[in-house]
Amino acid sequence: MLDNFIAHQTTKEFSVSEISNKIKELLENNFGYIKVKGEISGLKIANSGHAYFNLKENTAILACTCWRPILAKIKFPLNDGMEVVISGKLSSYAGNSRYQLSVDNLQPTGLGAMLQILNERKARLEKEGLFNKIRIPIPFLPDKIGVITSITGAVIKDIIHRIRERFPTRIIIWPVSVQGENSGNEIAEAIEGFNNLEEVNKPRVIIVARGGGSIEDLWSFNDEILVRAAYNSKIPIISAVGHEVDYTLIDLAADKRAPTPTAAAEFAVPVHSILNNTLQSYEKILLNNTSRLIKYHEQNIVNYNKIHRYLSHYINHRQQLLDETGFNLLDALPCFIELQETKIKSFSKERVNPAKIINYKTLELTHQTAYLSKSANNTLKNFEYKLELNSTLLASLDYHNVLKRGFAIVKGETGNFLSSKITAANEKIFNIKFSDGEIKVVRA
């Protein structure tokens, strides 16, 4: 009893604030930065943009607070029941005497939740067109190959070995972590880093590689920032993540997808021996074609020589004919000149005799006068015949002559002509004109 009293008297006294701060210091100093795995429950997002929820496992519960700047960095929606791994610092909240985890990073861990997030992200990025870019062809025989992967492990060794085995070339390694919270950012920065190098140091193709693993292990390669870096890369990218059955979002944004890291090395460079054999085959084909081409042109030269000899003979023959023609012309020219001089002299004599010219013109005038007289007589007879014909036709059309042939003209009382039964039906008085006179008839 006395001991209890003494202990009570010697126990240190704290205020509520002091004990709350003391507990806060103990939590923050002893636990520091931790990771906790559990299931989200009781999720609430305040108007301030901060998220409050519990992380539970069976009956145990850990209160969590995700501040707005951290929540904005999370690229998938939070839901109750989602399994996650949270990184952060333990602290206590004096307002209700509880401890809580201040979230610094949050990653999904349950397969169902991760697949849901993956499908939602894939649909959104596909809608943006990040998976439909124009693929850059992988260059043939690149002089520099960039490799982004972990510096440790079998992957980098397999890639280096395969490239050196097939076609040795310069390899530039950009070491990154291929798993973990910041892995996606590191790989994206490596892609951007290669693209920003000076042209002389820039690789011609980039291999992004990692060995196989679970969906959690490969999750960094589904990171949105990494997909955008692959899409924006001006250097062609070969993605080689996991095994052949493993697919990540970087595979859809890369210029070529390799089923394994070793296959990526094979896509990057050809086999030296096969290439050498191919070159030798091409060399043989080139030599054979060159030989045939030379023989073909040699035969053409022979044919051209034959044609040249024939043309020379033909030209010489034609030249001989031309010479003979020239000689004949020279011989005939004096005779031709003499003949033309004779014609000129004869023409001159005819021109100086006016009597002959007058007689010729008189005879020509006589012929023309006779032709004109005959033509005028023929034209006059033709006009007289047409006049007589038209007079006869005109006389036959005179209605007096028609009346003489027994016809009559019937008029109504008002003098209107009645040319049919219908027009005469309503008339009572008719005037009928004959060739020798006119009578009036009244209808009874």
Swiss-Prot record:
UniProt GO BP: DNA catabolic process
Main subcellular location of this protein, as a coarse class: cytoplasm
Reaction(s) the record says it catalyses: Exonucleolytic cleavage in either 5'- to 3'- or 3'- to 5'-direction to yield nucleoside 5'-phosphates
Family in the record: Belongs to the XseA family.
Functional description taken from the UniProt entry: Bidirectionally degrades single-stranded DNA into large acid-insoluble oligonucleotides, which are then degraded further into small acid-soluble oligonucleotides.
Compartment annotation: Cytoplasm
Record NCBIfam families: xseA
Enzyme class label: hydrolase
Domain of life, per lineage: Bacteria
InterPro entries: Exonuc_VII_L, Exonuc_VII_lsu_C, OB-fold_nuc-bd_dom
GO terms of molecular function: exodeoxyribonuclease VII activity; nucleic acid binding
Protein name (Swiss-Prot/TrEMBL): Exodeoxyribonuclease 7 large subunit
Keywords: Cytoplasm, Exonuclease, Hydrolase, Nuclease
Assembly and interaction partners: Heterooligomer composed of large and small subunits.
Gene: xseA
Entry's Gene Ontology cellular component terms: cytoplasm; exodeoxyribonuclease VII complex
Alphabetical list of Pfam families matching this protein: Exonuc_VII_L, tRNA_anti_2
EC number annotated for this UniProt entry: 3.1.11.6
Annotated organism of origin: Rickettsia africae (strain ESF-5)
